[in-house]
Amino acid sequence: MGSSKSSKKDKQIHPFGTDVSTFRKLSSKEKKKLDEKELKQYKKLKHKVKKLKKEERERSSIKNTKTLAEDPMVKNVAENDHDQMKNSLSRSQDKGNTDYWLAASLSGGNQRKSKFLKMLGIKNAASITESSPSAQSNKTNDKQREKELEQQYMHGVLHKGTKKGLGM
């Protein structure tokens, strides 16, 4: 009799398939028709299918990256990009990064400017901190800008909480 039970299990046809290759998703109506054991089997099989698909995607992405890495044209382009990056970095270091941080535009003495540049890690800070004529002409513009900012700040303080101009 024990053999007859196992043969009945083997003979059962599941609507979702018996292995990963024959798996198909079931609709909610079909899931409701399944008993508890069949539902557990369905969930296990669904999990296996998801896992296999994920592994296949990872394998294919690894294969794609390997083929790109083996391609001589891609290697040449990558080497050229790397060389260009090295050249641009060396040029920016030679300039002392003055393109990004202009110490001459800072207000204060040379000691303060050199300290600022040292904190940023810029070499040859002494040559950069020398004030240029353009920086001196900008001082009047800076004073005017500061005056306007102070006026705007005071205007904001006075009108704080009045809810004017907000469409309310």
Curated annotation (Swiss-Prot):
Extent of Basic and acidic residues compositional bias: 68-85, 140-150
Inducing stimuli: Differentially expressed during meiosis.
This protein's record includes keyword Coiled coil: yes
Domain of life of the organism encoding this protein: Eukaryota
GO molecular function, one term: RNA binding
Pfam families: SMAP (PF15477)
Coiled coil: 29-95
Entry annotated with the keyword Coiled coil: yes
Secretion signal span: none
Region Disordered, residue ranges: 1-35, 48-97, 126-168
Record-level GO cellular component terms: nucleolus
Keywords: Coiled coil
InterPro entries per record: SMAP_dom
Compositionally skewed regions (Polar residues) per UniProt: 126-139
Record field: compositional bias (Basic residues): 157-168
Name under which the protein is recorded: Uncharacterized protein tam10
